Amino acid sequence: VLCAEGCIEEVRVVGWRDSAYLHCAARIPRSVHVAALVSPFDSLVWHRPRTEALFGVRFRLEIYTPAPQRIHGYYVLPFVFGDTIVARADLKADRAAGILRVPQLTWEPGVPPEAGEALERELDDLAGWLGLADVAGPGLR
């Protein structure tokens, strides 16, 4: 119905088996400038096959995985830098200490150096939003 009404159009993406859809008002930017921690419940990463197709990264929420079998941590947020998932940060809000803890931080291969500073800014912003005073974890600051 939306295709027939001209609201969206069916498009083909190289390497994808299924069709994708593009909103008629969507504009494809020349480049993407974003740095964001993404909730594991965000629609961008919740649909795992689409996440793998878009980013070439296998993302799994490991909260129900027994601790010894976890790869990236308990509550992991992917970090998008530009148009790529470049890292995964396991986060824990330690409210008693006022610290956003990063027990584990995993970088994907080939990450540009400026991604580290961008991630630290995002972690600082998230800590502030949560009412926490600091961020602590291996490989930070």
Regions found by a protein language model. Give the residues of each.
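Long, charged, low-complexity, helical-prone intrinsically disordered regions
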Residues: 1-141
